Swiss-Prot record:
Membrane topology qualifier: Multi-pass membrane protein
Complexes and interactors: Interacts with chs3.
Transmembrane helix recorded as keyword: yes
Name of the protein in its database record: Chitin synthase export chaperone
Keywords, in A-Z order: Cell wall biogenesis/degradation, Endoplasmic reticulum, Membrane, Protein transport, Transmembrane, Transmembrane helix, Transport
InterPro entries attached to this UniProt entry: Chs7
Organism: Aspergillus clavatus (strain ATCC 1007 / CBS 513.65 / DSM 816 / NCTC 3887 / NRRL 1 / QM 1276 / 107)
Pfam families given in the database record: Chs7
Cited function: Chaperone required for the export of the chitin synthase chs3 from the endoplasmic reticulum.
Family: Belongs to the CHS7 family.
GO BP annotations, alphabetical order: cell wall organization; protein folding; protein transport
Gene name tied to this protein: chs7
Length: 332
């Protein structure tokens, strides 16, 4: 195995791109692809065959959790980095939808659109890591968050990495531009080296942010838990996927655990951001009722009324004195 080869990776885990890289296989009519040692069994539901049933189920859960996180972020109207972090969750949602379409077999392998969907999946993964990296700078207030510069810097860098990863993937799959399924160094560098660097730099920046600017150390727990579950997911995917698959009679494989662990890691990104972010209550719009609670009523004789004590005033018998308010049945 040389640097950038997917032979050993695809032998252990059935990644979608494994059917698009590697030498031609005479056992599959000369088609390109690397066959994994073990595949998760398919599930038949309503006369429809669903590939990777367990992983597909986790994708659906991830979509629901992402919607909840987006709604919570949107409710924090004045939080620092609100627009930037919500872009991260939108990209994660798009990646989850694309992965669900691929893993569930909506676009089956060997079909015409399949290489383009896998290339889009790779592009979204690169865009997600780049978006996370740029979000790491927001907390340092190098530029004003939520502004045109901040938001579009994030969007453009993420879009550029999506295009770069998509093009390298599709050129490799289609043997275009001097690239080929047997020359996967560029694809390996973009998918693994650059993405790993983005995540590592983000983690270092957040550690510096917490240690230097915050007195509370609880956010370090969110970072640590996110890193642990992410690493566990990657190890289960790339090192033990075939072992898991064989021992559970092909019901599960490493892709199921990696998808679940990635969801937990993304949730820790949200928890970390939510914990270190404070709203400006003076300018925020409350969405929860009864934010201010009256503990007890004043005595009757101490209540303020709008009646004037001067009986000779022309305003003493104002018609507004006895008008009932629609809020709390109070009299004005």
């Amino acid at each position: 195995m040389g640097f950038g080869d997917f032979d050993s990776i695809c032998a252990k885990t059935a990644l979608p791109l494994c059917s698009l890289v590697g030498p031609s296989s005479s056992s599959i009519s000369g088609s390109t692809g690397i066959i994994s040692n073990c595949y998760a069994r398919n599930v038949e539901l309503a006369n429809t065959i669903i590939f990777e049933g367990a992983a597909s189920f986790v994708h659906i859960i991830a979509l629901a959790m992402t919607v909840i996180m987006i709604l919570h972020v949107r409710s924090k109207f004045t939080a620092v980095g609100r627009k930037e972090i919500i872009t991260f969750f939108y990209i994660y949602m798009a990646l989850t939808i694309c992965s669900l379409v691929i893993d569930a077999g909506v676009v089956p392998p060997r079909s015409g659109p399949f290489p383009y969907f896998v290339a889009a999946q790779n592009g979204l993964a690169s865009a997600l890591c780049t978006c996370l990296l740029v979000n790491g700078f927001v907390g340092f207030q190098l530029y004003e968050d939520g502004t045109f510069l901040s938001v579009w810097l994030l969007r453009l860098t993420s879009a550029v990495m999506f295009v770069v990863s998509f093009l390298i993937s599709i050129l490799t799959f289609k043997s275009w531009g001097g690239m080929s399924p047997t020359n996967t160094i560029g694809l390996f560098v973009v998918l693994y080296i650059l993405n790993a660097l983005c995540i590592a730099i983000y983690l270092v920046m957040q550690l510096l942010l917490v240690m230097n600017t915050l007195e509370d150390r609880w956010p370090l727990g969110h970072i640590a838990f996110g890193v642990i579950v992410f690493i566990c997911g990657q190890v289960l995917l790339y090192a033990f996927s075939d072992t898991i698959c064989d021992n559970v009679q092909h019901y599960l494989d490493g892709l199921f655990f990696a998808t679940f662990c990635n969801l937990l890691a993304v949730m820790m990104v949200y928890k970390f951001w939510d914990y270190i972010t404070k709203e400006d209550l003076e300018f925020s719009v409350g969405i929860k009722p009864n934010t201010w609670e009256v503990k007890e009523l004043l005595p009757e004789e101490d209540r303020r009324t709008t009646a004037y004590q001067d009986s000779h005033s022309e305003y003493a018998g104002s018609m507004y004195h006895h008008r009932a308010s629609t809020y709390g049945n109070q009299n004005y």
